Amino acid sequence: MSLNVEKGKRKRIVIVGGGFGGLQVANGLKGTDYQVILIDKNNYHQFPPLIYQVASAGMEASSISFPFRRNFQKRKNFYFRMAELRAIYPEKKLLQTSIGKVEYDYLVLAAGATTNFFGNKNVEEWAMPMKTVDEAMGLQNAILSNIERSITCSTKQEQQELLNVVVVGGGASGVEIAGVLSEMKQTILPRDYHDLDPSLMNIYLIEAGNRLLSAMSPQSSEAVEKYLREMGVNILLNKMVTDYKDHKVVLADGSSISTRTFIWVSGVAAQQVGNLDEVHLGRGRRIKVDVFNRIEGLDDVFCIGDQCIIEGDKDYPNGHPQLAQTAIQQGNNLAKNFKRMAKGKPLTTFKYRNLGTMATVGRNKAVAEFAKIKMKGFWAWFMWLVVHLRSILGVRNKVVVLLNWMWNYFNYNQSLRMIFYPKKAKEIRDREERETKTHWGEDLLQR
């Protein structure tokens, strides 16, 4: 098996990862003389800021996803391949993937980050992350299925376990999913589940630090905490989760909370490249790059977004924030630098610009910070809607999301409360199992 892309005479740029950063590079190379190959394990781009709305059954997964091939269908020198990265061999300018190997002139690593369980294997096994569309759909099924089962279960203890929701992580994802589930409890349960007392549903938000939204100002943290408490969310600060057993989330102080809906959004970790030398890894095992996003010591390999860290920026000594705006800015700068390389011009250094931070917890409840301006309430919420709507790919998706938001706003009703358990065809199951055992590099390179 191979990627089946003829090399030709053009310089080839291989991009691994079609998130915000990778897509920005690919779009920025339009009209250039480069051959571009985009590799991603999915055949679509997903919009992470709205994944929590899929998880809460408030939005269709297709509304925040966009097929790569549609985005690039008019590009002659662009190729997409659905595959996973296995290893890189810079000395041979070779990339190993789950479907074979491919040569490159320039390589861009933009695979982003994954959920960080901080080495806790038991929590990793039982907790439900919310980083991808697939994970959000799985979480949606779990939430709805647990509510259904709570009506027919045999004991009060089991019912409480099914209706308790524990969210670990007080960042933007944590406060957003806690807020939207609280709204679901207040508006959906009384309408759809007449034989269920909504007050039995408890939502817990656990944060190891001393405040929510630690990346924002104390004022925004206080505002969000006030909103959530008013919405009935139980907030536990300075509490660390150590384990999950017997349907209980166990805290460091020995206390526990019974639940069968255990959501983990407590940080991210950079995607790892299995054979990359440890010398290239920095804080948080992010790949060290210079001010041009070039991996130190590897002139033709670049890394952008959540996967990389630029050390030495006095304004961000621990690295730039792992946010969409960072990946977009780095991707844009790198695309421009590839154009400059083609013309023999010097590269421009990357300089991060903080465009602001926002978080929403529910209808008319949000916080936003832009430079010295801090907002909360309706206008922050409205600004959040506008910014995210503009960022979604595709006119159809923008229209669908806007109409969905309008419907939910005026009717207090989410219409997607259906449980789907997709069954993969045997051919697909066999192929996935086969690809997990093959194409790991060294054996294939020797052939």
Task: Say what each PLM segment does.
Residues 326, 330, 335-447:
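C-terminal, flexible cofactor-proximal segment of oxidoreductases
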Residues 1-12, 78-166, 263:
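FAD-binding core/adjacent interface of flavoenzyme oxidoreductases
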Residues 112-115, 178, 268-270:
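Short glycine-rich anion-binding loops that position phosphate/pyrophosphate groups of nucleotides
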Residues 2-81, 172-215, 263, 446-447:
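Beta1-alpha1 glycine-rich phosphate/pyrophosphate-binding loop at the start
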Residues 18, 99, 111-112, 253, ...:
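Glycine-rich, N-terminal phosphate-binding loop of Rossmann-like dinucleotide-binding domains
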Residues 76-87, 182-291, 295-297, 347:
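A Rossmann-like FAD-binding core segment of flavoenzymes
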Residues 159-216, 223, 234-236, 321-349, ...:
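Rossmann-like dinucleotide-binding core of oxidoreductases
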Residues 125-156, 247-250, 256-329:
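FAD-site-proximal beta/loop scaffold in flavoenzymes
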